[in-house]
């Protein structure tokens, strides 16, 4: 009987330890458009690969950017273990790109959610903030782990690609919202910030010590490239324009830029070839190396402390 109780206690301890670990991510999935499709990088070609990638890495919660309604529907169909929260940026419903938060339904209870616009009037739908070229939004959730009962907030955004002031003031707005909304509860902010780690807006996110960059805070990191690839797997950059910021109560154990790719046949059928150093039983054909999006997803493993 003592052995049974001991095994049960050990099992509970392992379950609790696993529940304290949280894998989060950010993924600009690139909007669905015909220009990409004509080059072989269309959404229909890549979305199943993209969803398989998310599932393989086991994101517990992640933010996505540039998501149109049809893309959101495709992702939820391919990944039924996730629920999502978010609205279209143009009308606060389904028009325009979403910046949704996805979370695992079985693990988390949704306590609160919403969207605000990155502008001087965050509650006003569809507005452009400061010098932004487009309306920009931040969607958020407040979740509770069903096992540990720990509560935390998750914000996801896409900053403007043109407006310098909009990015700087937008970063100030995000910090203000985190302070006002979250209190002492942990908070995570993910997104395509459209600026790298050397930019003023990036450093604005770190001012006051409210948040830290998971890349810098990680005990271990695997990041052999930056986060933007322009649909070209041969390109390399030091710039990280996609970020995961966390409040100080969250421990960051690991961080990674996920550079997985896939291959499609060439337009003309390629002949079989043999590799000089390969076993002769192996044949190769020329294929095109592609990326699931024009951004690489990023991931961080966090520890949620009670």
What are these regions (language model features)?
Residues 22, 60-61, 152, 186-188, ...:
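Short, Asp-centered acidic motifs that coordinate Mg2+ and/or phosphate
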Residues 61-155, 159, 254-259:
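Structured beta-strand-rich core segments of catalytic domains in phosphoester-bond hydrolases
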């Amino acid at each position: 009987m003592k052995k049974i109780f001991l095994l049960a206690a050990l099992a509970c301890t392992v379950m609790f330890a696993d529940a304290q670990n949280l894998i989060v991510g950010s993924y600009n999935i690139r909007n669905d458009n015909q220009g990409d499709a004509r080059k072989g990088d269309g959404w229909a070609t890549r979305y199943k690969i993209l969803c398989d990638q998310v599932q393989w890495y086991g994101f517990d919660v992640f933010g996505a950017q540039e998501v149109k309604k049809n893309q959101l529907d495709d992702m939820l169909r391919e990944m039924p273990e996730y629920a999502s929260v978010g609205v279209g940026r143009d009308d606060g419903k389904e028009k325009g790109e979403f910046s949704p938060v996805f979370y695992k339904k079985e693990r988390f209870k949704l306590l609160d959610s919403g969207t605000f616009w990155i502008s001087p009037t965050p509650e006003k739908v569809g507005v452009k903030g400061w010098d932004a070229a487009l309306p920009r939004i931040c969607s958020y959730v407040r979740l509770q782990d069903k096992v540990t009962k720990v509560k935390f907030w998750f914000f996801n955004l896409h900053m403007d690609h043109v407006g310098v002031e909009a990015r700087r003031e937008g970063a100030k707005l995000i910090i203000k919202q985190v302070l006002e909304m979250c209190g002492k509860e942990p908070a995570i902010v993910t997104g395509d910030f459209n600026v790298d780690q050397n930019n003023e807006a990036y450093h604005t996110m770190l001012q006051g010590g409210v948040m830290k960059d998971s890349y810098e805070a990680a005990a271990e990191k695997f990041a052999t490239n930056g986060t933007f690839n322009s649909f070209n797997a041969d390109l390399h950059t030091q710039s990280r324009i996609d970020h995961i910021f966390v409040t100080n109560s969250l421990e960051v154990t690991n961080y990674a830029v996920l550079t997985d790719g896939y291959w499609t046949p060439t337009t003309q059928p390629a002949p079989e070839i043999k590799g000089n150093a390969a076993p002769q039983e192996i044949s190769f054909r020329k294929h095109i190396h592609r990326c699931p999006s024009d951004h690489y997803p990023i991931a961080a493993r966090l520890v949620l402390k009670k």
